[in-house]
């Protein structure tokens, strides 16, 4: 798949995870509804599905990775920032094929696109601290 299709998968995953976090619906239902309602022809759908399932299954683990580096309580984070960080931390911890810098840069771009003003700076700050611990060899 093209890098653009992966980027689109991440963008869709942020939107679907945002919905999941707010609704507390089953992730499979969120996925089904998202795919039924959105145009996903330029999306790496397999990667989108993996991100959704991976984040949903590993939420407590991913939250534990970010908590030491948050400047506020996890509960005080915006839902978009939480979704973006969870995706990046999933990629850093579970997808060694995704380069270190790609995971961070994609998260920054997602935060710029979907997050509040300056949320990309917050996301970058958290990942700059967490990533070297998750991947000490920076690969």
UniProtKB/Swiss-Prot annotation:
Gene3D superfamilies recorded: NusB-like
GO biological process: DNA-templated transcription termination; regulation of DNA-templated transcription elongation; ribosome biogenesis; transcription antitermination
GO CC annotation: cytosol; transcription elongation factor complex
Range of residues in the leader sequence: none
GO molecular function list: RNA binding
Disulfide bonds: none
Disruption phenotype: Inactivation of the gene causes cold-sensitive cell growth.
SUPFAM superfamilies hit by this protein: NusB-like
One Pfam match: NusB
InterPro entries in UniProt: NusB-like_sf (IPR035926), NusB_fam (IPR011605), NusB_RsmB_TIM44 (IPR006027)
Keywords in alphabetical order: Ribosome biogenesis, RNA-binding, Transcription, Transcription antitermination, Transcription regulation
Domain of life: Bacteria
Described function: Part of the processive rRNA transcription and antitermination complex (rrnTAC). The complex forms an RNA-chaperone ring around the RNA exit tunnel of RNA polymerase (RNAP). It supports rapid transcription and antitermination of rRNA operons, cotranscriptional rRNA folding, and annealing of distal rRNA regions to allow correct ribosome biogenesis. Involved in transcription antitermination. Required for transcription of ribosomal RNA (rRNA) genes. Binds specifically to the boxA antiterminator sequence of the ribosomal RNA (rrn) operons.
NCBIfam families in the record: nusB (TIGR01951)
Assembly: Monomer in solution. Forms a heterodimer with the ribosomal protein S10. The rRNA transcription and antitermination complex (rrnTAC) consists of RNAP, NusA, NusB, NusE (rpsJ), NusG, SubB, ribosomal protein S4, DNA and precursor rRNA; S4 is more flexible than other subunits.
Protein family per UniProt: Belongs to the NusB family.
Domain notes: The N-terminal region functions as an arginine-rich RNA-binding motif (ARM).
Protein name listed in UniProt: Transcription antitermination protein NusB
Name of the coding gene: nusB
């Amino acid at each position: 798949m093209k890098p653009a299709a992966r980027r689109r998968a991440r963008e869709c995953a942020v939107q679907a995870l945002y919905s999941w976090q707010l609704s507390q619906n089953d992730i499979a239902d969120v996925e089904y509804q998202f795919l039924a309602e959105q145009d996903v022809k330029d999306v790496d759908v397999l990667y989108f599905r993996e991100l959704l399932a991976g984040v949903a299954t590993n939420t407590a683990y991913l939250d534990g990775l970010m908590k030491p580096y948050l400047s506020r309580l996890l509960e005080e984070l915006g839902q978009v920032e939480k979704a973006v960080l969870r995706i990046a931390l999933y990629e850093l911890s579970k997808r060694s094929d995704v380069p270190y810098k790609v995971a961070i840069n994609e998260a920054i771009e997602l935060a710029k696109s979907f997050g509040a003003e300056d949320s990309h700076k917050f996301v970058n700050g958290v990942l700059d601290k967490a990533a070297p611990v998750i991947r000490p060899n920076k690969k």
